């Protein structure tokens, strides 16, 4: 299976940085993407809920700016890790934010829900 263009055209190394609970934040994700690897973070790191909106806006803005200034070396995409377990009361809101900001990659863990895949 061939890599999709979003990965083929931007990855310098075939790496997804681990979405580290509490540690991963916009600064780390932006640096990872600029370095050519998929930067990632757990949605639950953005607390309280409205902070996720701010994080995604900032990540998109910074990576868009980088890509405009460096057309020959575009940033790799980022990924948002979603906990799909029934105990995650934020899942619906967090997925709305991923859709709003067109998160390039969504990683799921601790369960599966068809509507998350369709988003």
How does the language model describe each region?
Residues 1-119:
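Active-site entrance/lid segments in N-terminal catalytic domains of soluble metabolic enzymes
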């Amino acid at each position: 299976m061939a890599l999709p263009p979003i990965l083929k055209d931007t990855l310098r190394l075939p790496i997804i940085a681990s979405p580290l609970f509490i540690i991963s934040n916009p600064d780390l994700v932006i640096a990872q993407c600029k370095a050519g690897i998929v930067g990632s973070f757990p949605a639950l790191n953005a607390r309280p809920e409205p902070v996720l909106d701010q994080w995604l806006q900032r990540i998109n803005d910074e990576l868009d700016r980088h890509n405009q200034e460096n057309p020959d070396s575009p940033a790799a995409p980022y990924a948002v890790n979603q906990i799909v377990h029934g105990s995650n009361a934020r899942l619906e809101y967090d997925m709305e934010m991923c859709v709003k900001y067109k998160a390039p990659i969504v990683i799921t863990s601790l369960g599966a829900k068809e509507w998350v895949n369709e988003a």
